[in-house]
Amino acid sequence: MRDRSVDLQRGILVILMLYAHLLQFFGDLQRFPSIHFWVMGISLLAFPAFVFCFGRTAALAYLKKPFRQALPRMGRTFGRCLAAFYVSGAAFRVLREHRPLEAETLRGILLLSDIPGWSEFLIAFALLMLSAIVLFPLLRQITCRRWLWLPLSIPCLLGCFLPYDRITVPQLALLMGSRSYVTFPVLQYFPFFLAGVAYTGASFRERLGMGGVAVIFSAAGLVWYVRHGLP
């Protein structure tokens, strides 16, 4: 039976993102300076929430099945996300930046050495699915031992303190982040995916516990940001 709560959550997130983009493109910042904070707040909330939903979807659609049975569908999802990135990235370079549609323009996108704007989230979802394929046995364990998501998330969160200035390879930036490229790094966002996997099928008490842990981590991150700024 399909879990409609995931669809509802994703629908709400899509509406929020559309609202944020409308404010970003058509809002009058001079008259309404608070628009910046609304756009930033929604943007900071939306992608982690989408990754959380992606984890829930993976748990429902793939992780309940044996690996050989789940692999073809996971592979198709990875392929669709990757193809969407290629199409979106090429369209951005050609239609928005007016670059010629030639091999030189496409080569960097195909090799992931060129990450065009407005396409970063697509390659992030492709790499998240690839990570789910590689880590399939571990993710299956989380569906049974849901507390595992927390110790597995801590090393990922420590990735927030990596020396981003030294990460200059675009393919590595997709995995770990960088100040040279706009990316949604898989390492730092993977805890949201793990939480989505653990949340699926959890009891009410387990979900309350996960919510409490999320509040604690969020509060700690906010305190760090106020005192030290971004890493």
Give residue ranges: language-model regions:
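Alpha-helical transmembrane segments and their immediate juxtamembrane cytosolic regions
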Residues: 1-231
